[in-house]
Regions:
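Pre-Walker A adenine-sensing motif
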Residues: 3-13
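Walker A (P-loop) phosphate-binding motif
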Residues: 13-40
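General beta-strand structural signal in soluble alpha/beta enzymes
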Residues: 23, 48-51, 83-86, 112-116, ...
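N-terminal phosphate/diphosphate-binding loop that engages ATP/GTP or pyrophosphate donors
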Residues: 39-85
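Ligand-binding beta-strand-loop-alpha-helix segment within the catalytic cores
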Residues: 74-101, 110
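Conserved catalytic-core segment of NTP-binding enzymes
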Residues: 91-98, 117-225
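Canonical P-loop GTPase G-domain recognition
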Residues: 222-240
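Single conserved hydrophobic/aromatic residue that forms the stacking wall/gate
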Residues: 241-253
Length: 253
């Protein structure tokens, strides 16, 4: 399916040079992964989707349980993409493969997309000490933050709310501000945690819920000042802006 918006371009992702992409942070990770998959297929790429934590199961999608290499190859040939993961019957969720299996599967595809964090649909989070679970083979890390957290109390909008409250040095009932989002996105104790020397991008989701674009633009500009490439938009209507120059484009979540 062709799209008016190219998220790969807007997030400045060089998937030829950096083919293993880990996605961390708040709600919207899975939707972003599926959107990137769609774009990559349009470009003729073979894509493996996987997780190092858990990911919502989708029974109608091509799936190779346990990352079985023969099945992965078969589905890549047929569908151009495959979800390779374990499967938990009791939760209905995809579950993680081993690092060794990820390294093996990496050789079978052009691009691997990895959901490497959990947030239980909360728009923002500050990771605990065991989070995120970025695989060793990852080249790029994209952190996702939902702009619907702006102005909302930490207790209502943040996953790991106590950790987020402690990190921001605010009460649980304090609202999340633009400055808080910048801090969370760029701190090594926030979503920049364990990124190390990898390429880093920030995607601010759900801009469609904002009455005005200025808060999102301000966050992106502040991230740019900190040498962080960022874009805001909606996987619903694809209205996006990337630093350093604004781009407003309409399309489809």
């Amino acid at each position: 399916m062709k799209h008016q918006i190219d998220f790969l371009e807007l997030l400045q992702i060089d998937y030829e040079k950096y083919p293993v992409i880990a996605v961390v942070g708040g709600g919207g990770k899975t939707s972003l992964i599926y959107r990137l998959t769609d774009e990559l297929i349009d470009k003729g790429k073979r894509v493996i989707i996987t997780t190092t934590t858990h990911m919502a199961g989708e029974s109608e999608l091509p799936f190779a349980r346990g990352g079985d290499a023969v099945r992965v190859k078969e589905l890549l040939d047929k569908e151009r993409y495959v979800i390779a993961a374990e499967y938990e019957e009791d939760t209905g969720k995809y579950a993680s493969l081993t690092e060794e299996k990820l390294e093996e599967l990496r050789e079978l595809c052009d691009v691997m997309l990895v959901e490497a964090d959990g947030a239980k649909h909360h728009p923002v989070k500050v990771p605990e000490k065991w989070e995120p679970v970025i695989p060793r083979c990852a080249d790029i890390v994209i952190s996702v933050i939902g702009l619907d957290c702006l102005g909302q109390p930490i207790s209502q909008s943040a996953y790991r709310m106590e950790r987020t409250s402690e990190f921001l040095r605010k009460s649980l009932e304090a609202p999340i501000t633009e400055e808080d989002i910048v801090k969370i996105a760029t701190s090594i104790c926030g979503l920049f945690k364990d990124v190390e020397e990898r390429v880093y991008r920030v995607y601010l989701n759900k801009s469609d819920i904002l009455r005005e674009k200025e808060p999102a633009e301000h966050i992106v500009e502040e991230l740019e000042r900190k040498n962080t490439v960022a874009a805001y938009g909606s996987l619903l209507d694809c209205l996006l802006y990337t630093s350093p120059s604004p781009r407003d484009i309409s399309g489809s979540r």
